[in-house]
Amino acid sequence: MGSDFKTIPIIDISPLVAKIDDPKLAASNDVMEVVRQLDEACKEAGFFYVKGHGVPDSMIKEVREITRSFFALPTEEKLKIKMTPKTGYRGYQNVGENITKGKPDMHEAIDCYRPILPGQYGDLAKALEGNNLWPETPSNFKALMEDYLSLVKDLSRKIMRGIALALGAPVDAFEGDCAGDVFWVLRIIGYPVSTDIPESERTDIGCGAHTDYGLLTLVNQDDEIQALEVQNRSGEWVYAVPLPGTFVCNIGDMLKVWSNGIYEPTLHRVTNKTPFYRVSVAYFYESNFDACIEPVECCMQRTGGIAKYDNIVYGEHLVKKVQTNFVEGRY
């Protein structure tokens, strides 16, 4: 956790996006100003908005609209793609089935992961093997989400190039053994109005306080519903106020280890206190599934010369988290 920030910084990354594959990227003053802002945001807040990202606003809105359409379907229709351990933890989960720190979260969701072939990572990924369960209704749901996935994956690569430069690493530091074959997670989430949940099952938390597991998260949230909160160093909760046309970005656990603590992920939660149903689509850009993440030399040199964290195999970290995130006995 960085500072006692009261607002979350907004970064126009258009210079970085425009020159992302230019061999002279790091020689551009405009690009290096974006890099400076990314560095400051990662240190001070662990969260930032990006604009000038190149993803069409029409696509961002359409993804939210189709998400809302799916969650408005009857429960029996949504349960056609019900998540279980047998589905590789992919599919639909009802309100209260996701658990954060032992407490049920007041949201429903479709969880998707990069498809994993049987035996692709040996026993490491056995729990998550399989393909995603896409709903048949709306009929264009799968096609739209796969187009969206392609765009946000590419955007994440661009932002991570900027973060690599901010840490004093080569621009492609996250494109080799660390994240050259990135794993990804997509959570398509709906937060009901609290009074629509039976009182006996209701809590006040849409998603409990947590940090994310991987390198970078991109959140596509409703334009007008204020619910995502980020905790500053003093323990105050600061709203990530919706800003149309932007993504809310935050860094995760793997980047903390890789940077040897130069960047630390920030606790965040969701509390939907409004009288409106809220949707959010979170894309998690992760390392290679079988990558062993460890502090890198350039970051250790800036932090005393000693590794502060043990090595972590990303896939082990993810599977352990996934298997503790759902209510036992409901499957």
Place the predicted regions along the sequence by residue.
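Peripheral, non-catalytic segments flanking oxidoreductase cores
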Residues: 1-331
